Amino acid sequence: MTRPQVPAVAVAAATNRSGTVTVRATDQGMPVEIRFERAEYRYGAPALAAEMLRLTQRSAIVARARRREQLAEAGVPEAMLDRLGLPTRQAAVDELDRLDDADTGQTSWLRNR
């Protein structure tokens, strides 16, 4: 029985709310594809660069969670995945929510307990 092939790198994409900027990045945080509409130039280079960095960070978080799942399917023990710092799917969702709150502020009047 052969083990499943694990890709050398995991990649994920993140898109801004308006769908005008998309970044694909590796689990190492390296952007491998950046696409944006020409209209984004109107906000200036610093704003466009900041949006690209934000989306790179978000896609890297998703890619790291995807990488964890790939390695787990290949038989890597949970303890090793934890030591590698690869987040679980839920931890990735929590981190993305935290980033959203930092970007937009709290979206609920309810207090976290």
Predicted features by range, described:
Residues M1-T22, F36-R113:
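Acidic, negatively charged sequence signal
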Residues A25-T26:
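Short, acidic, Ser/Thr-enriched surface-loop or helix-capping motifs
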